[in-house]
């Protein structure tokens, strides 16, 4: 379709999911309207997703309606922003028992990011709260070493 960029997120998320012994069960390219996002998230939840990852310009679009879609689905927004770099514009919410994460583009480009600090915990069933993110400020800055040694480094400690 006109206006769509080639998706670079899917292969990265598939690889990261496999590393967590998880799988991607659905990839949906939705429109930007709240209803489109509601329908896409609902479809994933109805298919049995334990976690829904939302990507695509959330951190650069002040008119992003993803939080509105989550609220419309009865969800609870836990955080939209973290003291972690890379990953400051990460979003976490819950719709029932399903975690819905908004992933910033750094997840595609960095070896270690907020994804690696949070998503494995969510997949293990941990229900994170706002306070959990506040505590990530200590150790939440990746030094972008020439040779990444994550998780054997201070990032996320």
List each model region and its residues.
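Glycine-rich phosphate/diphosphate-binding loop of Rossmann-like nucleotide-binding domains
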Residues: 1-36
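Short, surface-exposed connector motifs at secondary-structure boundaries
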Residues: 20-25, 47-52, 99
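A generic structural motif
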Residues: 25-29, 53-56, 81-82, 131-136
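Short, solvent-exposed amphipathic alpha-helical segments in soluble enzyme
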Residues: 8-14, 42-43, 68-72, 116-121
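Gly/Ser/Thr-rich loops at beta-strand to alpha-helix junctions
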Residues: 1-3, 57-61, 105-110
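Generic recognition of short, well-ordered alpha-helical segments
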Residues: 4-8, 39, 64-65, 113-114
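Flexible glycine/proline-rich
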Residues: 73-157
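Glycine-rich phosphate-binding loop
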Residues: 36-89
């Amino acid at each position: 379709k006109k206006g769509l960029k080639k998706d670079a997120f899917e292969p990265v998320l598939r690889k990261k999911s496999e590393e967590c012994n998880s799988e991607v069960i659905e990839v949906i390219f939705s429109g930007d309207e709240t209803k489109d996002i509601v329908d896409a998230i609902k479809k994933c939840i109805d298919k049995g997703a334990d976690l829904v990852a939302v990507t695509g310009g959330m951190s650069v679009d002040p008119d992003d309606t993803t939080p509105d879609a989550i609220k419309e689905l009865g969800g609870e927004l836990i955080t939209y922003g973290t003291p972690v770099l890379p990953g400051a514009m990460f979003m976490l919410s819950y719709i029932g028992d399903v975690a819905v994460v908004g992933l910033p583009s750094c997840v595609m480009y960095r070896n270690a990011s907020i994804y690696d600090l949070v998503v494995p915990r969510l997949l293990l069933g941990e229900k994170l709260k706002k306070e959990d993110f506040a505590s990530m400020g200590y150790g939440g800055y990746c030094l972008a070493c020439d040779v990444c040694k994550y998780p054997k480094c201070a990032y996320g400690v």
